[in-house]
Protein backbone atom coordinates (compact mmCIF):
# COMPACT_ATOMS: atom_id res chain seq x y z
CA UNK A 1 0.00 0.00 0.00
CA UNK A 2 1.34 3.39 -0.99
CA UNK A 3 0.85 6.57 0.97
CA UNK A 4 1.66 10.00 -0.40
CA UNK A 5 3.05 12.07 2.45
CA UNK A 6 4.34 15.55 1.82
CA UNK A 7 7.92 15.80 3.02
CA UNK A 8 10.09 18.13 1.10
CA UNK A 9 7.78 17.77 -1.94
CA UNK A 10 8.88 14.13 -2.27
CA UNK A 11 6.84 10.98 -2.51
CA UNK A 12 7.42 8.66 0.46
CA UNK A 13 6.04 5.31 1.50
CA UNK A 14 4.99 3.89 4.80
CA UNK A 15 7.36 1.25 6.08
CA UNK A 16 6.29 -2.36 5.74
CA UNK A 17 6.80 -4.73 8.72
CA UNK A 18 9.64 -6.46 6.87
CA UNK A 19 13.03 -5.45 8.25
CA UNK A 20 16.45 -6.03 6.80
CA UNK A 21 19.35 -6.90 9.03
CA UNK A 22 22.02 -4.32 9.71
CA UNK A 23 24.82 -4.92 7.22
CA UNK A 24 28.52 -4.26 7.29
CA UNK A 25 29.46 -0.73 6.30
CA UNK A 26 30.58 -0.48 2.68
CA UNK A 27 33.79 0.87 1.24
CA UNK A 28 32.01 3.49 -0.84
CA UNK A 29 35.10 5.44 -1.78
CA UNK A 30 36.04 2.77 -4.31
CA UNK A 31 33.09 3.62 -6.53
CA UNK A 32 33.87 5.73 -9.57
CA UNK A 33 31.91 8.34 -11.44
CA UNK A 34 30.83 7.65 -15.00
CA UNK A 35 33.42 10.04 -16.47
CA UNK A 36 36.24 7.93 -15.03
CA UNK A 37 37.30 10.33 -12.24
CA UNK A 38 37.48 9.05 -8.69
CA UNK A 39 34.72 10.29 -6.44
CA UNK A 40 35.71 12.58 -3.61
CA UNK A 41 35.12 11.45 -0.08
CA UNK A 42 31.64 12.82 0.62
CA UNK A 43 31.40 15.57 3.21
CA UNK A 44 28.87 15.21 5.99
CA UNK A 45 25.86 17.36 5.14
CA UNK A 46 23.54 15.86 7.75
CA UNK A 47 22.53 17.02 11.21
CA UNK A 48 21.00 15.25 14.17
CA UNK A 49 17.25 15.78 14.28
CA UNK A 50 17.07 16.42 10.54
CA UNK A 51 14.13 14.91 8.61
CA UNK A 52 15.33 12.96 5.59
CA UNK A 53 14.20 10.40 3.04
CA UNK A 54 16.01 7.07 3.27
CA UNK A 55 16.01 4.49 0.51
CA UNK A 56 15.28 0.99 1.79
CA UNK A 57 16.24 -2.39 0.33
CA UNK A 58 13.02 -2.46 -1.73
CA UNK A 59 14.11 0.63 -3.68
CA UNK A 60 11.53 2.96 -2.10
CA UNK A 61 12.04 6.08 0.01
CA UNK A 62 10.80 6.32 3.60
CA UNK A 63 10.58 9.36 5.86
CA UNK A 64 12.71 9.34 8.99
CA UNK A 65 14.66 11.45 11.46
CA UNK A 66 18.43 11.32 11.98
CA UNK A 67 19.43 10.48 15.57
CA UNK A 68 23.14 9.66 15.22
CA UNK A 69 25.85 10.26 12.62
CA UNK A 70 28.85 8.00 12.06
CA UNK A 71 31.37 9.89 9.94
CA UNK A 72 33.81 6.98 9.80
CA UNK A 73 31.25 4.57 8.33
CA UNK A 74 29.44 7.30 6.38
CA UNK A 75 26.06 6.37 7.78
CA UNK A 76 23.24 7.78 9.89
CA UNK A 77 21.08 6.14 12.53
CA UNK A 78 17.51 6.91 11.50
CA UNK A 79 14.20 6.42 13.30
CA UNK A 80 11.33 5.97 10.84
CA UNK A 81 7.67 6.86 11.15
CA UNK A 82 6.71 3.37 12.33
CA UNK A 83 9.31 3.61 15.16
CA UNK A 84 11.69 1.19 13.44
CA UNK A 85 15.39 2.05 13.60
CA UNK A 86 18.28 1.35 11.27
CA UNK A 87 21.68 2.58 10.11
CA UNK A 88 21.50 3.97 6.57
CA UNK A 89 24.45 4.86 4.35
CA UNK A 90 24.82 8.47 3.25
CA UNK A 91 24.44 7.51 -0.38
CA UNK A 92 20.91 6.27 0.36
CA UNK A 93 19.74 9.43 2.17
CA UNK A 94 18.09 12.38 0.45
CA UNK A 95 17.66 15.76 2.11
CA UNK A 96 15.64 18.81 1.22
CA UNK A 97 16.97 22.25 0.30
CA UNK A 98 19.18 23.83 2.94
CA UNK A 99 17.92 26.88 4.82
CA UNK A 100 21.12 28.85 4.23
CA UNK A 101 21.49 31.13 1.25
CA UNK A 102 24.51 29.27 -0.10
CA UNK A 103 23.75 26.75 -2.84
CA UNK A 104 26.25 23.93 -3.22
CA UNK A 105 26.29 20.91 -5.48
CA UNK A 106 24.80 17.87 -3.75
CA UNK A 107 27.46 15.61 -5.26
CA UNK A 108 30.74 17.54 -4.95
CA UNK A 109 29.70 20.08 -2.29
CA UNK A 110 31.23 22.93 -4.35
CA UNK A 111 29.64 26.36 -4.88
CA UNK A 112 31.03 27.41 -8.27
CA UNK A 113 28.73 27.61 -11.29
CA UNK A 114 30.47 28.26 -14.57
CA UNK A 115 29.84 27.07 -18.11
CA UNK A 116 29.98 24.33 -19.25
CA UNK A 117 29.44 23.02 -15.73
CA UNK A 118 26.76 25.29 -14.30
CA UNK A 119 24.61 24.63 -11.28
CA UNK A 120 21.06 23.39 -11.98
CA UNK A 121 18.35 23.46 -9.31
CA UNK A 122 15.80 20.64 -9.06
CA UNK A 123 12.23 21.95 -9.23
CA UNK A 124 11.06 19.21 -6.86
CA UNK A 125 13.51 19.02 -3.94
CA UNK A 126 15.43 22.29 -4.43
CA UNK A 127 18.82 20.55 -4.46
CA UNK A 128 21.56 21.85 -6.74
CA UNK A 129 23.62 19.75 -9.17
CA UNK A 130 26.49 20.57 -11.48
CA UNK A 131 25.83 19.56 -15.06
CA UNK A 132 28.72 17.08 -15.06
CA UNK A 133 28.15 15.83 -11.51
CA UNK A 134 24.61 14.64 -12.15
CA UNK A 135 23.98 11.22 -13.70
CA UNK A 136 23.20 11.41 -16.55
CA UNK A 137 24.88 14.70 -17.40
CA UNK A 138 22.49 17.64 -17.65
CA UNK A 139 22.17 19.05 -21.15
CA UNK A 140 22.66 22.79 -21.59
CA UNK A 141 19.21 23.07 -23.17
CA UNK A 142 17.68 22.41 -19.74
CA UNK A 143 19.18 25.65 -18.40
CA UNK A 144 17.62 27.78 -21.15
CA UNK A 145 14.26 25.98 -20.99
CA UNK A 146 11.32 27.04 -18.83
CA UNK A 147 10.16 23.44 -18.35
CA UNK A 148 10.44 21.81 -14.95
CA UNK A 149 13.51 19.69 -14.36
CA UNK A 150 13.72 16.89 -11.77
CA UNK A 151 16.94 15.41 -10.48
CA UNK A 152 17.60 11.68 -10.62
CA UNK A 153 16.55 11.11 -7.00
CA UNK A 154 13.22 12.87 -7.46
CA UNK A 155 12.47 11.04 -10.71
CA UNK A 156 12.86 7.72 -8.92
CA UNK A 157 10.93 8.96 -5.87
CA UNK A 158 7.93 9.96 -7.99
CA UNK A 159 7.80 6.92 -10.30
CA UNK A 160 8.90 3.87 -8.31
CA UNK A 161 6.24 1.89 -6.49
CA UNK A 162 5.45 -1.61 -5.28
CA UNK A 163 4.60 -3.92 -8.14
CA UNK A 164 6.67 -1.98 -10.68
CA UNK A 165 7.43 1.58 -11.70
CA UNK A 166 5.08 3.81 -13.69
CA UNK A 167 4.89 3.01 -17.41
CA UNK A 168 3.02 6.07 -18.70
CA UNK A 169 3.30 9.81 -18.27
CA UNK A 170 6.11 12.38 -18.44
CA UNK A 171 7.78 11.12 -15.28
CA UNK A 172 7.80 7.56 -16.64
CA UNK A 173 9.59 8.80 -19.77
CA UNK A 174 12.08 10.68 -17.62
CA UNK A 175 12.69 7.50 -15.64
CA UNK A 176 13.44 5.57 -18.82
CA UNK A 177 16.05 8.17 -19.73
CA UNK A 178 17.62 8.01 -16.27
CA UNK A 179 17.83 4.22 -16.48
CA UNK A 180 20.12 4.36 -19.51
CA UNK A 181 23.04 5.13 -17.18
CA UNK A 182 23.99 3.98 -13.69
CA UNK A 183 25.16 6.35 -10.93
CA UNK A 184 28.06 4.02 -10.13
CA UNK A 185 30.65 1.90 -11.91
CA UNK A 186 29.66 -1.77 -12.05
CA UNK A 187 33.30 -2.80 -12.44
CA UNK A 188 34.18 -1.34 -9.03
CA UNK A 189 31.63 -3.41 -7.11
CA UNK A 190 33.06 -6.22 -4.98
CA UNK A 191 30.78 -9.25 -5.25
CA UNK A 192 30.59 -12.49 -3.33
CA UNK A 193 31.21 -15.88 -4.94
CA UNK A 194 27.59 -16.33 -6.01
CA UNK A 195 27.30 -12.75 -7.36
CA UNK A 196 24.36 -12.02 -5.08
CA UNK A 197 25.68 -9.38 -2.67
CA UNK A 198 28.38 -6.73 -2.93
CA UNK A 199 30.37 -4.91 -0.29
CA UNK A 200 29.17 -1.47 -1.36
CA UNK A 201 25.47 -2.38 -0.98
CA UNK A 202 24.90 -0.85 -4.40
CA UNK A 203 22.23 -2.35 -6.66
CA UNK A 204 19.72 -1.47 -9.34
CA UNK A 205 19.37 1.75 -11.35
CA UNK A 206 18.90 3.71 -8.13
CA UNK A 207 22.18 2.57 -6.55
CA UNK A 208 20.41 1.70 -3.29
CA UNK A 209 20.60 -1.37 -1.05
CA UNK A 210 18.84 -4.60 -1.87
CA UNK A 211 18.14 -8.21 -0.88
CA UNK A 212 18.40 -10.65 -3.79
CA UNK A 213 16.17 -13.23 -2.08
CA UNK A 214 13.16 -10.90 -1.88
CA UNK A 215 11.73 -9.02 -4.87
CA UNK A 216 14.64 -8.44 -7.24
CA UNK A 217 15.51 -9.42 -10.82
CA UNK A 218 19.00 -10.25 -12.02
CA UNK A 219 20.10 -9.11 -15.46
CA UNK A 220 21.38 -12.13 -17.39
CA UNK A 221 24.06 -9.98 -19.07
CA UNK A 222 25.61 -7.70 -16.44
CA UNK A 223 24.47 -9.88 -13.47
CA UNK A 224 23.35 -6.82 -11.49
CA UNK A 225 20.20 -7.05 -9.36
CA UNK A 226 17.24 -4.68 -9.84
CA UNK A 227 14.33 -3.82 -7.54
CA UNK A 228 10.79 -4.72 -8.48
CA UNK A 229 9.83 -1.10 -7.71
CA UNK A 230 12.35 0.30 -10.23
CA UNK A 231 11.62 -1.82 -13.31
CA UNK A 232 8.90 -0.92 -15.82
CA UNK A 233 8.44 -4.27 -17.56
CA UNK A 234 6.34 -6.15 -14.99
CA UNK A 235 2.71 -6.93 -15.74
CA UNK A 236 1.98 -8.36 -12.28
CA UNK A 237 3.67 -7.80 -8.89
CA UNK A 238 6.50 -10.20 -8.11
CA UNK A 239 6.60 -12.88 -5.44
CA UNK A 240 9.44 -13.10 -2.94
CA UNK A 241 12.42 -14.99 -4.34
CA UNK A 242 10.84 -15.44 -7.78
CA UNK A 243 13.78 -15.65 -10.20
CA UNK A 244 12.03 -17.57 -12.97
CA UNK A 245 12.61 -14.77 -15.46
CA UNK A 246 14.98 -13.95 -18.26
CA UNK A 247 15.65 -10.26 -17.66
CA UNK A 248 17.84 -7.73 -19.49
CA UNK A 249 18.18 -4.26 -17.98
CA UNK A 250 17.89 -0.96 -19.85
CA UNK A 251 21.65 -0.37 -19.64
CA UNK A 252 22.48 -3.65 -21.40
CA UNK A 253 19.67 -3.34 -23.93
CA UNK A 254 20.30 0.40 -24.53
CA UNK A 255 16.55 0.88 -24.40
CA UNK A 256 13.48 -0.68 -22.79
CA UNK A 257 13.91 -3.67 -20.53
CA UNK A 258 13.39 -7.23 -21.76
CA UNK A 259 11.48 -9.74 -19.65
CA UNK A 260 10.42 -13.32 -20.38
CA UNK A 261 8.79 -15.76 -17.99
CA UNK A 262 10.46 -19.15 -17.61
CA UNK A 263 8.30 -22.30 -17.45
CA UNK A 264 7.29 -23.57 -14.02
CA UNK A 265 6.76 -27.12 -12.80
CA UNK A 266 4.57 -28.14 -9.90
CA UNK A 267 7.58 -28.60 -7.65
CA UNK A 268 8.65 -25.03 -8.45
CA UNK A 269 5.19 -23.70 -7.60
CA UNK A 270 5.14 -25.56 -4.30
CA UNK A 271 8.68 -24.43 -3.43
CA UNK A 272 8.07 -20.78 -4.37
CA UNK A 273 4.80 -20.53 -2.46
CA UNK A 274 6.16 -22.25 0.65
CA UNK A 275 9.08 -19.83 0.59
CA UNK A 276 6.73 -16.83 0.34
CA UNK A 277 4.59 -18.13 3.19
CA UNK A 278 7.67 -18.57 5.37
CA UNK A 279 8.82 -15.00 4.62
CA UNK A 280 5.39 -13.52 5.32
CA UNK A 281 4.39 -15.53 8.40
CA UNK A 282 7.86 -16.21 9.88
CA UNK A 283 7.22 -19.91 10.47
CA UNK A 284 8.25 -23.17 8.83
CA UNK A 285 5.29 -25.57 8.55
CA UNK A 286 2.03 -24.89 6.74
CA UNK A 287 -1.13 -26.89 6.15
CA UNK A 288 -0.88 -28.19 2.59
CA UNK A 289 -4.58 -27.70 1.87
CA UNK A 290 -5.78 -24.87 4.09
CA UNK A 291 -2.75 -22.59 3.86
CA UNK A 292 -0.55 -23.60 0.93
CA UNK A 293 -3.31 -24.25 -1.60
CA UNK A 294 -5.17 -21.13 -0.49
CA UNK A 295 -2.07 -19.05 -1.17
CA UNK A 296 -1.48 -20.76 -4.55
CA UNK A 297 -5.05 -20.17 -5.71
CA UNK A 298 -5.07 -16.55 -4.55
CA UNK A 299 -1.79 -15.80 -6.35
CA UNK A 300 -2.32 -18.01 -9.40
CA UNK A 301 -2.07 -15.08 -11.84
CA UNK A 302 1.07 -13.73 -10.17
CA UNK A 303 2.73 -17.13 -10.57
CA UNK A 304 2.43 -16.96 -14.37
CA UNK A 305 2.27 -20.78 -14.52
CA UNK A 306 2.44 -20.93 -18.33
CA UNK A 307 1.39 -24.37 -19.56
CA UNK A 308 -0.08 -25.16 -16.14
CA UNK A 309 -2.37 -22.11 -16.22
CA UNK A 310 -5.35 -24.08 -17.54
CA UNK A 311 -5.22 -26.64 -14.73
CA UNK A 312 -8.63 -26.68 -12.98
CA UNK A 313 -8.59 -25.51 -9.39
CA UNK A 314 -9.92 -28.88 -8.23
CA UNK A 315 -6.89 -30.71 -9.70
CA UNK A 316 -4.13 -28.41 -8.47
CA UNK A 317 -3.94 -29.86 -4.97
CA UNK A 318 -3.30 -33.35 -6.29
CA UNK A 319 -0.29 -32.17 -8.32
CA UNK A 320 1.10 -30.05 -5.49
CA UNK A 321 0.75 -32.88 -2.95
CA UNK A 322 2.51 -35.26 -5.32
CA UNK A 323 5.43 -32.84 -5.65
CA UNK A 324 5.64 -32.40 -1.88
CA UNK A 325 5.84 -36.15 -1.34
CA UNK A 326 8.20 -36.92 -4.23
CA UNK A 327 10.88 -34.34 -3.41
CA UNK A 328 11.62 -35.37 0.16
CA UNK A 329 15.04 -33.73 0.18
CA UNK A 330 13.43 -30.40 -0.67
CA UNK A 331 10.26 -30.53 1.44
CA UNK A 332 9.86 -31.73 5.01
CA UNK A 333 6.65 -33.36 6.21
CA UNK A 334 5.26 -32.81 9.67
CA UNK A 335 5.18 -36.54 10.38
CA UNK A 336 8.98 -36.57 10.37
CA UNK A 337 8.96 -34.54 13.59
CA UNK A 338 5.86 -36.21 15.04
CA UNK A 339 3.43 -33.59 13.80
CA UNK A 340 0.49 -33.88 11.44
CA UNK A 341 1.40 -35.44 8.11
CA UNK A 342 -0.40 -32.81 6.05
CA UNK A 343 1.98 -30.10 7.32
CA UNK A 344 4.87 -29.28 5.00
CA UNK A 345 7.81 -26.90 5.06
CA UNK A 346 11.10 -26.26 3.30
CA UNK A 347 14.10 -28.15 4.64
CA UNK A 348 16.28 -25.16 3.78
CA UNK A 349 14.56 -21.78 3.48
CA UNK A 350 15.95 -20.54 0.17
CA UNK A 351 14.18 -19.49 -3.04
CA UNK A 352 13.87 -22.07 -5.83
CA UNK A 353 16.62 -22.13 -8.44
CA UNK A 354 15.47 -21.32 -12.00
CA UNK A 355 16.43 -23.83 -14.71
CA UNK A 356 17.81 -21.35 -17.22
CA UNK A 357 21.40 -21.41 -18.43
CA UNK A 358 22.30 -18.12 -16.81
CA UNK A 359 21.95 -19.58 -13.34
CA UNK A 360 23.53 -22.98 -13.93
CA UNK A 361 27.01 -21.58 -13.47
CA UNK A 362 25.95 -20.20 -10.08
CA UNK A 363 24.52 -23.43 -8.69
CA UNK A 364 27.71 -24.46 -6.94
CA UNK A 365 28.38 -21.13 -5.18
CA UNK A 366 24.74 -20.87 -4.19
CA UNK A 367 24.78 -24.32 -2.65
CA UNK A 368 27.43 -23.25 -0.16
CA UNK A 369 26.49 -19.64 0.41
CA UNK A 370 25.78 -18.35 3.92
CA UNK A 371 24.62 -14.91 2.93
CA UNK A 372 20.99 -14.82 3.90
CA UNK A 373 18.59 -15.92 6.53
CA UNK A 374 15.28 -14.42 7.46
CA UNK A 375 15.03 -15.47 11.09
CA UNK A 376 18.00 -13.36 12.10
CA UNK A 377 19.68 -16.32 13.76
CA UNK A 378 23.46 -16.41 13.54
CA UNK A 379 25.01 -19.12 11.42
CA UNK A 380 28.51 -20.38 11.91
CA UNK A 381 30.85 -20.03 8.96
CA UNK A 382 32.66 -23.26 8.14
CA UNK A 383 36.37 -23.19 7.49
CA UNK A 384 37.68 -23.04 3.96
CA UNK A 385 38.94 -26.61 4.15
CA UNK A 386 35.61 -28.06 5.19
CA UNK A 387 33.84 -25.98 2.57
CA UNK A 388 35.98 -27.43 -0.17
CA UNK A 389 35.22 -30.92 1.03
CA UNK A 390 31.55 -30.06 1.24
CA UNK A 391 31.51 -28.84 -2.33
CA UNK A 392 33.06 -32.03 -3.60
CA UNK A 393 30.66 -34.18 -1.63
CA UNK A 394 27.56 -32.21 -2.46
CA UNK A 395 28.28 -32.54 -6.16
CA UNK A 396 28.03 -36.30 -5.83
CA UNK A 397 25.12 -36.31 -3.41
CA UNK A 398 23.15 -33.88 -5.52
CA UNK A 399 22.51 -36.42 -8.28
CA UNK A 400 20.65 -38.71 -5.91
CA UNK A 401 18.79 -36.15 -3.83
CA UNK A 402 16.68 -34.25 -6.35
CA UNK A 403 14.37 -37.12 -7.18
CA UNK A 404 16.14 -38.33 -10.29
CA UNK A 405 16.44 -42.13 -10.54
CA UNK A 406 19.99 -43.44 -10.07
CA UNK A 407 21.72 -45.59 -12.63
CA UNK A 408 21.36 -49.39 -12.60
CA UNK A 409 24.74 -49.93 -10.94
CA UNK A 410 24.13 -47.31 -8.29
CA UNK A 411 20.66 -48.71 -7.65
CA UNK A 412 22.21 -52.14 -7.05
CA UNK A 413 24.55 -50.66 -4.47
CA UNK A 414 21.70 -48.88 -2.70
CA UNK A 415 19.56 -52.00 -2.60
CA UNK A 416 22.34 -54.08 -1.06
CA UNK A 417 22.94 -51.44 1.56
CA UNK A 418 19.24 -51.07 2.32
CA UNK A 419 18.92 -54.81 2.93
CA UNK A 420 21.09 -54.54 6.02
CA UNK A 421 18.95 -54.38 9.20
CA UNK A 422 20.80 -51.31 10.40
CA UNK A 423 19.45 -49.18 13.17
CA UNK A 424 17.54 -46.34 11.48
CA UNK A 425 18.75 -43.89 14.05
CA UNK A 426 22.41 -44.69 13.53
CA UNK A 427 22.09 -44.58 9.76
CA UNK A 428 20.52 -41.14 9.72
CA UNK A 429 23.17 -39.80 12.06
CA UNK A 430 26.23 -41.07 10.26
CA UNK A 431 26.34 -38.58 7.34
CA UNK A 432 27.20 -35.76 9.73
CA UNK A 433 30.30 -37.66 10.79
CA UNK A 434 31.95 -36.96 7.48
CA UNK A 435 31.95 -33.21 8.08
CA UNK A 436 32.24 -32.44 11.80
CA UNK A 437 33.34 -28.86 11.15
CA UNK A 438 30.15 -27.99 9.29
CA UNK A 439 26.85 -27.22 10.94
CA UNK A 440 24.88 -30.39 11.60
CA UNK A 441 21.36 -29.12 11.94
CA UNK A 442 20.63 -25.46 11.37
CA UNK A 443 18.42 -23.51 9.07
CA UNK A 444 20.76 -20.52 8.85
CA UNK A 445 22.91 -21.67 5.94
CA UNK A 446 21.42 -20.89 2.54
CA UNK A 447 21.89 -24.03 0.52
CA UNK A 448 20.47 -24.57 -2.93
CA UNK A 449 17.17 -26.41 -2.93
CA UNK A 450 18.59 -28.94 -5.33
CA UNK A 451 21.48 -29.96 -3.08
CA UNK A 452 21.40 -32.67 -0.47
CA UNK A 453 19.88 -31.53 2.79
CA UNK A 454 20.77 -34.59 4.85
CA UNK A 455 23.54 -32.73 6.67
CA UNK A 456 21.17 -30.02 7.85
CA UNK A 457 18.12 -31.99 8.96
CA UNK A 458 17.77 -35.06 11.06
CA UNK A 459 14.47 -36.30 9.71
CA UNK A 460 15.56 -37.92 6.46
CA UNK A 461 14.57 -41.51 5.90
CA UNK A 462 17.08 -44.33 6.24
CA UNK A 463 17.14 -45.11 2.54
CA UNK A 464 17.75 -41.50 1.55
CA UNK A 465 20.52 -41.10 4.08
CA UNK A 466 22.19 -44.33 3.03
CA UNK A 467 22.12 -43.19 -0.58
CA UNK A 468 23.69 -39.87 0.34
CA UNK A 469 26.32 -41.65 2.42
CA UNK A 470 27.31 -43.91 -0.46
CA UNK A 471 27.59 -40.85 -2.66
CA UNK A 472 29.96 -39.28 -0.17
CA UNK A 473 32.30 -42.27 -0.15
CA UNK A 474 32.24 -42.43 -3.93
CA UNK A 475 33.14 -38.74 -4.05
CA UNK A 476 36.00 -39.06 -1.57
CA UNK A 477 37.75 -41.80 -3.54
CA UNK A 478 36.64 -40.73 -6.99
CA UNK A 479 40.15 -40.67 -8.42
CA UNK A 480 40.76 -44.29 -7.42
CA UNK A 481 37.30 -45.59 -8.20
CA UNK A 482 38.00 -45.71 -11.92
CA UNK A 483 40.77 -48.30 -11.46
CA UNK A 484 38.54 -50.74 -9.61
CA UNK A 485 36.10 -53.26 -10.98
CA UNK A 486 32.42 -52.81 -10.32
CA UNK A 487 32.17 -56.05 -8.34
CA UNK A 488 34.26 -54.92 -5.41
CA UNK A 489 32.27 -51.77 -4.64
CA UNK A 490 28.90 -53.24 -3.59
CA UNK A 491 30.74 -55.53 -1.16
CA UNK A 492 33.20 -52.99 0.19
CA UNK A 493 30.93 -50.04 0.78
CA UNK A 494 28.19 -51.74 2.81
CA UNK A 495 30.96 -53.36 4.85
CA UNK A 496 32.39 -49.90 5.53
CA UNK A 497 28.99 -48.63 6.62
CA UNK A 498 28.61 -51.48 9.11
CA UNK A 499 32.03 -50.88 10.59
CA UNK A 500 31.03 -47.25 11.21
CA UNK A 501 27.67 -48.18 12.75
CA UNK A 502 26.93 -48.90 16.37
CA UNK A 503 25.87 -52.55 16.10
CA UNK A 504 27.91 -55.23 17.93
CA UNK A 505 30.85 -56.74 16.09
CA UNK A 506 29.31 -60.22 16.19
CA UNK A 507 26.07 -58.97 14.67
CA UNK A 508 28.00 -57.24 11.92
CA UNK A 509 29.83 -60.44 11.04
CA UNK A 510 26.55 -62.36 10.86
CA UNK A 511 24.96 -59.77 8.57
CA UNK A 512 28.06 -59.68 6.42
CA UNK A 513 27.89 -63.43 5.82
CA UNK A 514 24.26 -63.13 4.72
CA UNK A 515 24.71 -60.26 2.30
CA UNK A 516 28.12 -61.01 0.81
CA UNK A 517 28.88 -64.65 0.00
CA UNK A 518 32.05 -64.08 -1.97
CA UNK A 519 35.55 -64.82 -0.80
CA UNK A 520 35.88 -63.23 2.66
CA UNK A 521 39.61 -62.92 2.46
CA UNK A 522 39.37 -60.92 -0.75
CA UNK A 523 36.63 -58.75 0.74
CA UNK A 524 38.65 -57.98 3.88
CA UNK A 525 41.62 -57.08 1.75
CA UNK A 526 39.47 -54.76 -0.37
CA UNK A 527 37.99 -53.16 2.73
CA UNK A 528 41.37 -52.49 4.30
CA UNK A 529 42.64 -51.06 1.04
CA UNK A 530 39.55 -48.88 0.60
CA UNK A 531 39.69 -47.72 4.21
CA UNK A 532 43.34 -46.72 3.79
CA UNK A 533 42.52 -44.75 0.66
CA UNK A 534 39.72 -42.84 2.35
CA UNK A 535 41.93 -42.01 5.31
CA UNK A 536 44.60 -40.69 2.99
CA UNK A 537 42.07 -38.53 1.17
CA UNK A 538 40.76 -37.12 4.44
CA UNK A 539 44.18 -36.47 5.96
CA UNK A 540 44.43 -32.99 4.44
CA UNK A 541 41.16 -31.96 6.07
CA UNK A 542 42.11 -33.56 9.43
CA UNK A 543 38.99 -35.73 9.35
CA UNK A 544 40.49 -39.14 10.00
CA UNK A 545 37.95 -41.92 9.91
CA UNK A 546 39.40 -43.91 12.79
CA UNK A 547 39.22 -40.86 15.06
CA UNK A 548 35.57 -40.48 14.21
CA UNK A 549 34.85 -44.15 14.87
CA UNK A 550 36.51 -43.96 18.27
CA UNK A 551 34.62 -40.83 19.29
CA UNK A 552 31.10 -41.59 18.09
CA UNK A 553 29.83 -41.69 21.66
CA UNK A 554 31.43 -38.36 22.53
CA UNK A 555 30.16 -36.77 19.34
CA UNK A 556 26.53 -37.77 19.57
CA UNK A 557 25.96 -37.87 23.31
CA UNK A 558 22.50 -39.10 24.23
CA UNK A 559 21.11 -40.98 21.26
CA UNK A 560 17.61 -40.64 22.62
CA UNK A 561 17.67 -36.87 22.19
CA UNK A 562 18.50 -37.24 18.53
CA UNK A 563 15.79 -39.88 18.10
CA UNK A 564 13.26 -37.42 19.47
CA UNK A 565 14.22 -34.92 16.80
CA UNK A 566 16.19 -32.48 18.92
CA UNK A 567 18.44 -30.29 16.80
CA UNK A 568 22.08 -29.60 17.53
CA UNK A 569 25.17 -27.84 16.22
CA UNK A 570 28.82 -28.84 16.41
CA UNK A 571 30.65 -25.81 17.82
CA UNK A 572 34.20 -27.07 18.29
CA UNK A 573 36.54 -30.03 17.96
CA UNK A 574 39.65 -30.85 19.99
CA UNK A 575 42.21 -33.61 20.38
CA UNK A 576 43.20 -34.53 23.94
CA UNK A 577 46.72 -35.45 25.05
CA UNK A 578 45.92 -39.15 24.87
CA UNK A 579 44.79 -38.82 21.26
CA UNK A 580 41.01 -38.78 21.77
CA UNK A 581 38.89 -36.53 19.56
CA UNK A 582 36.13 -34.67 21.37
CA UNK A 583 33.36 -32.43 20.04
CA UNK A 584 31.48 -29.58 21.67
CA UNK A 585 27.79 -29.94 20.78
CA UNK A 586 25.13 -27.31 21.33
CA UNK A 587 21.65 -28.76 21.86
CA UNK A 588 18.52 -26.83 21.01
CA UNK A 589 17.08 -27.69 24.40
CA UNK A 590 13.66 -28.90 23.32
CA UNK A 591 12.58 -32.08 21.58
CA UNK A 592 9.91 -32.29 18.93
CA UNK A 593 6.48 -32.96 20.28
Swiss-Prot record:
Residue location of crosslink Glycyl lysine isopeptide (Lys-Gly) (interchain with G-Cter in SUMO2): 360, 522
Alphabetized InterPro entries for the sequence: KDM4-like_Tudor, Mtf2_C_dom, MTF2_PHD1, MTF2_PHD2, Tudor, Zinc_finger_PHD-type_CS, Znf_FYVE_PHD, Znf_PHD
A GO CC term assigned to this protein in UniProt: cytoplasm
Record's compositionally biased regions (Polar residues): 447-470
Phosphothreonine sites (modified residues): 24
Phenotype upon gene inactivation: Mice survive to birth; however, most of them die before weaning. Axial skeletal alterations that are characteristic of posterior transformations are observed: ectopic ribs that associate with the seventh cervical vertebra (C7) are frequently observed. Consistent with this malformation, sternums are shifted anteriorly. The odontoid process, which is normally a characteristic of the second cervical vertebra (C2), is frequently associated with the first cervical vertebra (C1).
Signal peptide: none
Positions carrying Phosphoserine: 452
PANTHER family attached to this UniProt entry: METAL-RESPONSE ELEMENT-BINDING TRANSCRIPTION FACTOR 2, POLYCOMB-LIKE TRANSCRIPTION FACTOR
Protein name as annotated: Metal-response element-binding transcription factor 2
Gene this chain is encoded by: Mtf2
Amino acid sequence: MRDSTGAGNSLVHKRSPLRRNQKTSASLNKLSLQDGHKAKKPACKFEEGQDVLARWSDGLFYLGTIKKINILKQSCFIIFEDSSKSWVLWKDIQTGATGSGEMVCTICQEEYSEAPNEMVICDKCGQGYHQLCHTPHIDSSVIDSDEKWLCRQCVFATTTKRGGALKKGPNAKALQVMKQTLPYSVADLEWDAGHKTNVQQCYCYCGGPGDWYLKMLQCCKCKQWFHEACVQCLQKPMLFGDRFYTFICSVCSSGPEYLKRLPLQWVDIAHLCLYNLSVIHKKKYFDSELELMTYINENWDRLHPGELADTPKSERYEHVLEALNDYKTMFMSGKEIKKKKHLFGLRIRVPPVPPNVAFKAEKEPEGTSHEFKIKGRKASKPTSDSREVSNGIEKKGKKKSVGRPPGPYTRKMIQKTAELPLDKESVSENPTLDLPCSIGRTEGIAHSSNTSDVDLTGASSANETTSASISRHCGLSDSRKRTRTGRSWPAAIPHLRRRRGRLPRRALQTQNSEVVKDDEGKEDYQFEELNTEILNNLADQELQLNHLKNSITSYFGAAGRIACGEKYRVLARRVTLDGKVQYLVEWEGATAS
